[in-house]
Amino acid sequence: MPHIDSMMTPFPHSIEASVTIHDAQAIMASEGIRHLPVTSEGRLVGMISDRDLKLAYALAGSSQSEETLHVGDVCNLEAYITEYNTPVDDVVMHMAEIRVGTAMITRNGKLVGIFTTTDVCRNYAELLKIAYPDA
């Protein structure tokens, strides 16, 4: 079974927990991404998604503006993190079991990649082409 590092997206963008949600949304829009691993003082602490940002904007209302809410205030601190040499099937099954669309991939505690449902679909399509070359 191949390891997750053979199917992940390497060197993902990440964001510091102290950055405003406004800036996080701008980064996601400019890079065309939906997930950002969150770091604090160089340590991986969570994940923020475009869905998290939409919810934060909806709940903030007049109590907090987008300039005062920070990524660390709204990110998922329970994000799925696994090592680069974990078998792909284990990662995909665990993602399905805990119902998440993203896994952050580390090597010796350092972020080296991200694996999303988009990566699952891309790799599945490649396998289908191999299994059914004449289709």
Give residue ranges: language-model regions:
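Tandem CBS (Bateman) regulatory domains
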Residues: 1-11, 49-80, 87-96, 111, ...
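The conserved cystathionine-beta-synthase
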Residues: 14-32, 39, 81-99, 105-106, ...
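A glycine-centered beta-loop-beta connector
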Residues: 28-31, 36-52, 95, 103-119
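C-terminal basic regulatory modules in eukaryotic proteins
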Residues: 70, 101-102
